[in-house]
């Protein structure tokens, strides 16, 4: 009887939606942070006045949907844990 009860408890726990949250890197600290359920991670890059000497500006974050950006701004969105690491310079 105890085995049956334990099995039912385990199956119930496995079948419940436990409110999975995604982990995304967030700037300025580039730390991995829990984001709300259903959000996506993003990496946004663009050039400013110092692009030739410092490289592209980078913003990492999470949002309910992939953000809309202006022309000249690149964005990549993803939906797995820590899928938006700080880009390496070529």
Swiss-Prot record:
Expressed by the venom gland. InterPro entries: Snake_3FTx, Snake_toxin-like_sf, Snake_toxin_con_site, Toxin_cobra-type. Pfam families: Toxin_cobra-type (PF21947). One of its GO terms (molecular function) is ion channel regulator activity. Residues 1-21 form the signal peptide. The keyword Signal applies. Keywords: Acetylcholine receptor inhibiting toxin, Disulfide bond, Ion channel impairing toxin, Neurotoxin, Postsynaptic neurotoxin, Secreted, Signal, Toxin. GO terms for cellular component: extracellular region. Disulfide bonds join 24-41, 35-62, 47-51, 66-77, 78-83. The keyword Signal applies. It is found in: Secreted. Gene3D superfamilies: CD59. Binds with high affinity to muscular (alpha-1/CHRNA1) and neuronal (alpha-7/CHRNA7) nicotinic acetylcholine receptor (nAChR) and inhibits acetylcholine from binding to the receptor, thereby impairing neuromuscular and neuronal transmission. Belongs to the three-finger toxin family. Long-chain subfamily. Type II alpha-neurotoxin sub-subfamily. This is Long neurotoxin 7. It comes from Naja sputatrix (Malayan spitting cobra).
